[in-house]
């Protein structure tokens, strides 16, 4: 019986990807800029402060903020975005049912 040839993974000839931490920061910045076009900046500041108080200045906190902003933007667009700024005149506030803390 022939001897098995050991498996060798292919060489990675692609360019090096940016570090994970930098990618998370870049994605958060892009989502934040998009969110500022659609939501009241005070709402986004309050959300950012909440996440910071809960997670501190960590990648976990950045990931949580990314997830929340993605969901908020998805629901906003799904509801028929007319480029209104939610929380200001001309747009309803989907978070109005939540009492302020």
From Swiss-Prot:
Its main location: virion. Keywords: Activator, AIDS, Cell cycle, Host G2/M cell cycle arrest by virus, Host nucleus, Host-virus interaction, Modulation of host cell cycle by virus, Phosphoprotein, Transcription, Transcription regulation, Viral penetration into host nucleus, Virion, Virus entry into host cell. It holds the Pfam family VPR. InterPro entries: RetroV_VpR/X. One of its GO terms (biological process) is viral penetration into host nucleus. It is found in: Virion; Host nucleus. The modification Phosphoserine is found at residue 84. GO terms for cellular component: host cell; host cell nucleus; virion component. Stimulates gene expression driven by the HIV-2 LTR. Prevents infected cells from undergoing mitosis and proliferating, by inducing arrest or delay in the G2 phase of the cell cycle. Cell cycle arrest creates a favorable environment for maximizing viral expression and production. Interacts with human UNG. This is Protein Vpr. It comes from Human immunodeficiency virus type 2 subtype B (isolate EHO) (HIV-2). The lineage of its organism: Viruses, Riboviria, Pararnavirae, Artverviricota, Revtraviricetes.
């Amino acid at each position: 019986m022939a001897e098995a040839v050991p498996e060798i993974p292919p060489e990675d000839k692609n360019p090096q990807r940016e570090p994970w931490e930098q990618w998370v920061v870049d994605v958060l910045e892009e989502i934040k800029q998009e969110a500022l076009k659609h939501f009241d900046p005070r709402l986004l500041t309050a959300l950012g402060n909440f996440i910071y108080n809960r997670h501190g200045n960590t990648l976990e906190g950045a990931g949580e903020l990314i997830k929340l902003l993605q969901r908020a933007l998805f629901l906003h667009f799904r509801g028929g975005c007319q480029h209104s700024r939610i929380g200001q005149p001309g747009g309803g506030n989907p978070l109005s049912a939540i009492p302020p803390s």
